[in-house]
Amino acid sequence: MSDDRGIKVILLGEAGVGKTNLIHAALGGKFNPNSSTTITNEFYDSVVSFNNKNYAYFIWDTAGQEAYRAINKIFIKDSKIIFLVFSIDSKKSFEEIDFWINYVNEILGKGDHIIILIGNKSDLFLNQEVEDEDIKKKAEELKIRMKITSALKDGEGFKNYLEELLKEYILKHNTKEIEKPKETFTLDQEKIENNNDGTNKNKKTKKKCPCFKF
């Protein structure tokens, strides 16, 4: 996907680590404790405002099951911000990060993309199987950024973090502005506010796309 269409963001990781709920948080939606495992790749388009200009971006939610990994290869292409997600209460999901980073590097090489290691479900600290120090060491080993978060307890924090990454990319790459925000729909087809004061009522679109290629 070229920047003319928007900045491509993708979340990768094993099934059940909370990728979908992180996306809900990023788009200002509510945490869904009954969220089911993603079995098709879906994307959501939205807009970030920066310096009185609007910029389009797309967030891809991917299936984490091994059977879908070959399909994910298609969707990683042209990604600019990549979140490698694991759950702190699942050592196995953390161990699989090596697979995902190698997968991304194989497809994207040494491009201008940003990769972030995300330790999700920090609210489940009583069941924590991955220590903070191990997460830090892994990020240093892979030479990527890291963030420990919770889609349940810190959804707003993750939303703000994504927006800062988008702004960083916009500044660095002189990303093309869009003329006006698109009128779209939310995760549950209802309007959601983009900010706390309710002044921005742009909506978001969810689209299922198991075989779409940019």
Give the role of each language-model region.
Residues 33-34, 94-95, 128-129:
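Conserved catalytic-core motifs of eukaryotic protein kinase domains, centered on the activation segment
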Residues 55-70:
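Switch II (G3) loop of P-loop NTPases
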Residues 69-91, 97, 103-107:
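Inter-motif core of Ras-like GTPase G domains
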Residues 67-71, 93, 134, 157:
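Short acidic active-site motifs
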Residues 63, 88, 122:
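Conserved Walker B
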Residues 28-36:
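Post-Walker A helix-loop "phosphate-sensing" segment adjacent to the P-loop in P-loop NTPases
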Residues 1-20, 24-28, 47-54, 108-214:
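Conserved P-loop small GTPase signature centered on TRAFAC-class small GTPases
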Residues 59, 85, 118:
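Generic enzyme active-site microenvironment
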